[in-house]
Amino acid sequence: MVPLPWELEEDILSRLAAQSLVRFRSVCKRWNYLFDEKSFIKNHFARACPQFIFMTDSNIYSIEIIGLDGVDPTIKLRVLDSSGIPYRDWKFAYITITACDGFLFCNSWASPKGTAFWNPWLKQVKWIEYEDKGFNVCGLGYDNTRDGKVYKILGYLMCRPEDGSSYVYHQRVAIYDCASHAFKFIEISNKDWFLTDVTRFSVSLNGNLYWLSPIPNTDDFLIQCFDFSREICKPFCLLPCRKFDAFDLLVSFQGR
């Protein structure tokens, strides 16, 4: 039997579901090495079918859209195994869930457990350890100017003044590096507005974090961006629509 050209073999593998790739790691060393290559991971993300997580009090569902580019797309619904899912016993009350690259990060300000890194498709959970359990997660991203992808979490801690002059706690914005397990405090202007808006509804896209933010004393809105490569918050664009509802949501579709 004539083997397939390697380029074709790699192309076929990049179109398979993540669950299948995990099983295929043991087929041969070449495939095992391939699945860790950055170019393969990038192609796999680009070709992945849109999937959603739907949570109820009793079950957690995976919703997959098949044939989205065709004239008659279909929806495939299946129940996910809920064993080991972070904060499942809490029924996700007081839980903040943010997403990046198909992974979910679960955090609760009311629990001493901290933040969980959750891969719902492979049923894998890893708890992110940090010394201060009072870290409140706002969103996550990574430095998109580097070759290696190191996830970073944007959030804040409740801190006392360093000189101990007061028992009044105040919010300090910080970045948690998932590789070095280190915190870095940063200064943000209009901090109160920043923390309220980014914690409510934020979207991670290509390493940066985006969210809707009202312009104080006006009815106008803009999209704010936190750039993890420069570790700064900056305006992205002014929205043409004005404020009209109490709930405004920013979403991304197929990475755009």
From Swiss-Prot:
CDD domains found in the cross-reference section: F-box_AtFBW1-like
Q: Pfam families of this UniProt entry?
A: F-box (PF00646), FBA_1 (PF07734)
SUPFAM superfamilies, per the entry: F-box domain
List, for all copies, the residue spans of the domain called F-box. 1-44
Q: Which InterPro entries match?
A: F-box-assoc_dom_typ1, F-box-assoc_interact_dom, F-box-like_dom_sf, F-box_dom, SCF_F-box_component
Q: Which PANTHER family match?
A: BNACNNG10540D PROTEIN (PTHR31672), F-BOX PROTEIN CPR30-LIKE (PTHR31672:SF13)
Name of protein: Putative F-box protein At3g51171
Q: Which organism is it from?
A: Arabidopsis thaliana (Mouse-ear cress)
